[in-house]
Amino acid sequence: MYDISGWKHVFKLDPNKELSDEHLEMICESGTDAVIVGGSDGVTIDNVLHMLVSIRRYAVPCVLEVSNVEAITPGFDFYYIPSVLNSRKVEWVTGVHHEALKEFGDIMDWDEIFMEGYCVLNPEAKVAQLTDAKCDVTEDDVIAYARLADKLLRLPIFYLEYSGTYGDVELVKNVKAQLKQAKLYYGGGISNAEQAKEMAQHADTVVVGNIIYDDIKAALKTVKAVKGE
């Protein structure tokens, strides 16, 4: 079994986006610590299975970040369950999770499941609109969400999600200083190695996503930038 606490760099692949076999191989053989499969819309059992089968040709750990209960399938190493802490809708905090546990609770392998406390900070992002996230927040608000995840809920992951725009480095630094046991994931807007390296100075794990589809070479360079190799 893999130890997620040591992951510094992960790629996130959207099953609803096209990725050539050649580029998928580059991603999986890049030296990244893991590949997360997940997206905000268009996630189906068919495209998740296609992605799983494709990734399983390689040795890299793979994680399903669950956004659609109907698209859950066995075969992933881990399952990340996001709870959007700054959502205005309870369904995205605990509601969907409650329904899933009613249906699948008896067959879930809890050693494979990790809850993520999300704080979504880009109001233009699909995930913000889908979950009705309250993005007009102060640094004190974000730190309070971090403490909620880390100290009250004891979640293993606190995820700062800027999704599509590069985040506030000073905020990321200050959030990291508040966390005692939760790992800080950062995702959003990383388009080059320099940005990846900058965020890696503060976040435990840097998530690289959209740039995969825009500039594969730039995406691959983020691995060494983050891991210092």
Swiss-Prot record:
Give the gene name: pcrB
Q: Which GO terms describe its molecular function?
A: heptaprenylglyceryl phosphate synthase activity; magnesium ion binding
Its needed co-factors are:
Mg(2+)
Task: Tell me the protein's name.
Answer: Heptaprenylglyceryl phosphate synthase
Superkingdom per UniProt:
Bacteria
Enzyme Commission numbers on file: 2.5.1.n9
Role description: Prenyltransferase that catalyzes in vivo the transfer of the heptaprenyl moiety of heptaprenyl pyrophosphate (HepPP; 35 carbon atoms) to the C3 hydroxyl of sn-glycerol-1-phosphate (G1P), producing heptaprenylglyceryl phosphate (HepGP). This reaction is an ether-bond-formation step in the biosynthesis of archaea-type G1P-based membrane lipids found in Bacillales.
Residues that, per the record, bind Mg(2+): D14, S40
Name the species this protein comes from: Bacillus cereus (strain AH187)
Q: What residues does sn-glycerol 1-phosphate bind to?
A: K12, Y159, L160, E161, Y162, S163, G164, G189, G209, N210
What InterPro entries does the entry give?
GGGP/HepGP_synthase_I, GGGP/HepGP_synthase_sf, GGGP_HepGP_synthase
